[in-house]
Amino acid sequence: MKYTQKKPAIVLLEDGTVFHGKAVGKEGSAFGEICFNTGMTGYQEIFTDPSYFGQIMVAATVHIGNYGAFSEENESDGVKIAGLVCRNFSEYGSRPISEESLGAFLERQNLFVVSDVDTRALVSYIRDHGSMNAVLSTEVDNIEGLKAQLKAQPSMKGLALAPEVSTKEAYFVGDENAPYRVAALDLGIKRNILRNLAARGAYIKVFPHTATFEELSAFAPDGFFLSNGPGDPEPLTEAITLTQQVIDSGKPVFGICLGHQLIALSQGVPTYKMRNGHRGINHPVKNLLTGKSEITSQNHGFAVDKELAEKNPNIEITHLHLNDGTVAGIRLKNRPVFSVQYHPEAAPGPHDASYLFDQFIELMTSNK
């Protein structure tokens, strides 16, 4: 396999900083916003999460690929990251349920991987200087040319990427005789979200990002779900309008990550691009309604403006990130609507927040 071959490669950052490594398999160049994930496990779920579309992922954990790949752990129809940077890329994986090596899996997906990088130094650099555009390349003698190409790459701020990963056609998940019907807007939805809803008695119709309120309503849903997804939420004007329409319907609405941001935007509360974002499986969040803390899986580079959310008469902040105090959850005071800026479905990560799916079911029960 070509993923056992290694050629010299570089990680060139937007500010001109260069990190050296070796290309694992694919040659050429790959562009994207570089960021890092601190999770020690769950690489396959991370690579296939549509929320990472357009991003180069730096794995903070040392070993990648050492437990192979298993198709049931894909969170979408394929790899969504633009490239991978790691310290050690394992050619062989060992796990009873593993179907193939990660190298074989990524070779089929044609992903650009650079290994043998000092990821400890790279993660520290991104932490100190913020996420920025970068290029992975085997053109190690063409740095000036790569800099010119990199300069032409658009910033993540202002990019509407959800249309790139949304389904093209509506589809169904679950038992059509289930007690609850949920209309889900796919902005980059993860499969484990759908599994969690279906396991709790929901029959879900997943709609593309172009769906209208009339199309969602024709399904006669008991509630609406607004999914996670990549990019900047503010350019998604049609989705923001649709979000306001489903809120005005009076039916329960549950939003995760990008869906959470759309709910805030629909209420006039802006979002902003974070310096680094939150990407990992051990982020502490405090539930302000119960006083309890939970460890959560997070993946986002934008956040809801806390000061303006606090001033908004329709919004109550329900969760806060304990590391930096950013908004991690809200609910509306006048509607059965709530959302969180993290992933209660995990995949990967802890299950402390799985109660949020139960909360959605309870809201649909009480509003039937």
Residue map of PLM features:
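RNA-binding accessory domains that recognize and position tRNA/RNA substrates
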Residues: 1-214, 218-219, 231-233, 347, ...
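Proline-centered loop/turn at the N-terminus of a beta-strand
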Residues: 112, 181, 252-254, 270, ...
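Beta-strand-turn-beta hairpins that frame and shape the catalytic cleft
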Residues: 176-182, 290-293, 332-337
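Residues that mark the start of a beta-strand
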Residues: 179-183, 203, 252, 295, ...
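Active-site-proximal beta-strand elements of phosphoester/diester hydrolases
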Residues: 181-186, 296-297, 338-342
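Cysteine-nucleophile active-site neighborhood
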Residues: 223, 227-306, 349-365
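A glycine-centered loop/beta-turn motif at secondary-structure junctions
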Residues: 329-367
